[in-house]
């Protein structure tokens, strides 16, 4: 029994979208998404090599992309991809055994086999039930896959969020297979330890602001110095989790959400505001503006937690857990990129003649034209979501919890557009912004 092919519905084309999405764009997007699904691997290389085609196409579609723009962005992503691996049919027939499935988790060569397994499960049970069983059920398998959802700078959970947001079973299957075949930087240990500590500590009557926890990360020498430049791409595994795992879990455990719908909504908005703030406020005095590559992912993924908390078929306590894990990992990622010094002026005072007059619709139009893998479009769309979700909390009793205020959202979106436009992929962002080394790039000289 095969999963339904991708068929985008005009009524489910994103929670942040333009008013009119061309019908021929839906048709083109369906075709390109199926071609990617059938022909290409989820990973263009075994480590840190995610196929971004789905993310890019669905994001720009929601921002009003034409069929040509969709094809152009597809073409941007194709050169680095590799063919989807062959299905191991012998293993496929055994994956319904939980022990065998558990042993297969983390095997990137089995992506296609896992994809076919999850497509079968979705065809038999429905995509919502498959998510319940394999992500949310709090079994050993579900907790293992849930932790892997947050691996790779949130790529699997972004994929899952898109599958839910656009209500596409095949995209959900891809997300499950991506998480199940993903490598491991041991963030599951961080989640487990933080959750255990939160479970035995007495909850504070007034929650500590996430931005205060960010400041505590920077002030904690054990955590701040844990990632080293020489760790390169393993700063999470070897640095924050490896050298400061206990301290990081203890600090992260302080981000807690009561099982209350309004508290969940506010806390999700707080997470979004905090991520946007440290992404934009982490500049380097005397150098050109540039957004950190990893902090950018904290923002792009944040939109999907707005999607998750709106799913009434997911139990409240499970939606709470999804957001708690996101914020706790955000704190760790802030440390991974060097616990950069933060200053609101970099966002609030941002001005550039090239973009000062641009509104959201102008930015959507501009970013859809960019040769990109979707990161800039995702970032801008997530900021628009943040503006909408956070505005009611930015003044009044929760003001101190929300560092992004008013037009800072639009200014940060303009900064993204200005600093990524017409640049090659390796110069659109800066990696590990809290370290001095990446800021020595010649293109960042004032």
UniProtKB/Swiss-Prot annotation:
Pathway: Secondary metabolite biosynthesis. Disruption phenotype: Leads to the accumulation of chrysophanol. Signal peptide: none annotated. Disulfide bonds: none annotated. One of its GO terms (molecular function) is oxidoreductase activity. The keyword Disulfide bond does not apply. InterPro entries: Questin_oxidase-like. Coiled coil: none annotated. It comes from the Eukaryota. Its EC number is 1.-.-.-. Keywords: Oxidoreductase. Baeyer-Villiger monooxygenase; part of the gene cluster that mediates the biosynthesis of the dimeric xanthones cryptosporioptides. The pathway begins with the synthesis of atrochrysone thioester by the polyketide synthase dmx-nrPKS. The atrochrysone carboxyl ACP thioesterase dmxR1 then breaks the thioester bond and releases the atrochrysone carboxylic acid from dmx-nrPKS. Atrochrysone carboxylic acid is decarboxylated by the decarboxylase dmxR15, and oxidized by the anthrone oxygenase dmxR16 to yield emodin. Emodin is then reduced to emodin hydroquinone by the oxidoreductase dmxR7. Belongs to the AflY oxidoreductase family. This is Baeyer-Villiger monooxygenase dmxR6. It comes from Cryptosporiopsis sp. (strain 8999). The gene is dmxR6.
């Amino acid at each position: 029994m095969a999963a339904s092919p991708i068929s985008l519905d005009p009524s489910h084309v994103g929670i942040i979208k333009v008013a009119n999405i061309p019908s021929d764009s839906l048709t083109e997007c369906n075709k390109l998404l199926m071609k990617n699904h059938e022909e290409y691997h989820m990973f263009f290389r075994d480590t840190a090599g995610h196929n971004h085609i789905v993310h890019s196409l669905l994001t720009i579609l929601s921002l009003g992309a034409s069929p040509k723009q969709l094809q152009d962005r597809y073409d941007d992503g194709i050169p680095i991809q590799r063919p989807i691996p062959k299905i191991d049919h012998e293993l496929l027939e055994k994956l319904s055994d939980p022990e065998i499935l558990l042993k297969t988790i983390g095997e990137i060569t089995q992506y296609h086999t896992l994809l076919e397994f999850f497509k079968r499960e979705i065809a038999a049970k429905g995509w919502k039930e498959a998510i319940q069983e394999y992500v949310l059920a709090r079994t050993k398998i579900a907790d293992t896959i849930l932790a892997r959802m947050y691996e790779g700078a949130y790529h699997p959970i972004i994929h899952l969020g898109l599958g839910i947001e656009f209500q596409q079973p095949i995209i959900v299957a891809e997300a499950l297979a991506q998480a199940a075949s993903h490598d491991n930087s041991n963030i599951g240990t961080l989640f487990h330890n933080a959750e255990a500590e939160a479970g035995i500590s007495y909850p504070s009557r007034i929650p500590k602001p996430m931005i205060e926890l960010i400041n505590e990360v920077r002030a904690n020498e054990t955590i701040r110095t844990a990632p080293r430049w020489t760790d390169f791409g393993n700063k999470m595994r070897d640095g924050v989790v490896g050298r400061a795992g206990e301290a990081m879990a203890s600090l992260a455990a302080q981000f807690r959400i009561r099982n209350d719908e309004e508290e969940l909504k506010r806390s999700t908005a707080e997470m979004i505001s905090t991520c946007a703030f440290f992404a934009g406020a982490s500049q380097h005095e005397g150098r050109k503006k540039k957004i950190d590559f990893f902090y950018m992912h904290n923002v792009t993924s944040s939109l999907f937690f707005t999607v998750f908390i709106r799913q009434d078929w997911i139990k409240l306590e499970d939606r709470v857990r999804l957001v708690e894990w996101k914020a706790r990992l955000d704190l760790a990622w802030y440390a991974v990129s060097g616990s950069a010094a933060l200053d609101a002026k970099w966002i609030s005072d941002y001005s550039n003649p090239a973009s000062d007059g641009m509104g959201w619709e102008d930015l959507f139009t501009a970013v859809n034209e960019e040769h990109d893998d979707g990161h800039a479009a995702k970032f801008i769309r997530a900021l628009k979501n943040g503006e909408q979700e956070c505005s009611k909390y930015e003044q009044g009793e929760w003001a101190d919890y929300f560092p992004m205020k008013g037009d800072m959202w639009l200014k940060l979106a303009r900064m993204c557009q200005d600093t990524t436009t017409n640049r090659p992929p390796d110069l659109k962002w800066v990696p590990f912004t809290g370290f001095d080394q990446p800021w020595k790039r010649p293109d960042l000289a004032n």
